[in-house]
Amino acid sequence: MMASAPQDRPAGTPPQGRGLLIVVTGASGVGKGTLRERWLAGQDVFYSTSWTTREPRPGEVNGRDYVFVSPAEFLAKAQQNGFLEHAQFVGNHYGTPIEPIEAALERGQDVVLEIEVEGAMQVKDRMGEQAILVFIMPPSLTELRRRLTGRATETPERIEKRLTRARDEIQAAHDFRYVIVNDNLDRAVSELLAVQQAERAAQKAAEHWTPEEQQARALADTVRSTALSREALQQVVES
């Protein structure tokens, strides 16, 4: 059972000394992987490698991008309650092993998950407000279609399935704490760094924040999902 937060710290933030659990999610093709690599470069964070039953894409490395397993191996792990979350997406299974995540959080190391939206919501249900959900959004569905087509790894039918699912996910963007539009990589990286620094600062009283932490909080507030209008989301799915 999680300890309650001290009164000088916002409810739901992890205890001081415990790592942050940052969950990055979004539609396939939105650029999560590239963004995550730039954001975490040089950082001492624990990046959780998901298990999956899908086939590796060209250039993917087992154990770095995913742990590629058979359906039987995946099912056995799930039956042992070995996943923090797991979900099926476009015919393949994805899951996040729980043991290494808890160990990293306990030693004060920030943990980053890059997972599907369904899995992200499972993490939120299980971890509550300690799970910092960041939704990466495309500037438009037209741009997302272009990126998916350009990868040349999906059939037209699967691309249409991904776009249909992406439309639903974008319209539910207010379910996440933060929403970052990935139309400019440098800006998106800066916003992710600000979110991380602001959430770390939230573990202590605001009067103890440094000027850099105050600046990070101000930038992070601009990408809170509450700052995004329904009209803006509708514009993304219709463009």
Curated annotation (Swiss-Prot):
InterPro entries named among the record's database cross-references: GK/Ca_channel_bsu, Guanylate_kin-like_dom, Guanylate_kinase, Guanylate_kinase_CS, P-loop_NTPase
Binding site for ATP: G26, A27, S28, G29, V30, G31, K32, G33
Function: Essential for recycling GMP and indirectly, cGMP.
Keyword Membrane annotated: no
Annotated PANTHER family: GUANYLATE KINASE, GUANYLATE KINASE-RELATED
Subcellular location: Cytoplasm
E.C. number(s) listed in UniProt: 2.7.4.8
GO CC terms, sorted: cytosol
NCBIfam families in the cross-refs: guanyl_kin
Catalytic activity: GMP + ATP = GDP + ADP
Stretches of the chain forming a coiled coil according to its record: none
Matching SMART domains: GuKc (SM00072)
One Gene Ontology molecular-function label: ATP binding
Principal location listed in the UniProt entry: cytoplasm
Leading EC class: transferase
Alphabetized CDD domains for the sequence: GMPK
Signal sequence region: none
One Pfam family this sequence matches: Guanylate_kin
Name of this chain's protein: Guanylate kinase
Family the UniProt entry places it in: Belongs to the guanylate kinase family.
Domain Guanylate kinase-like: 19-197
Keywords: ATP-binding, Cytoplasm, Kinase, Nucleotide-binding, Transferase
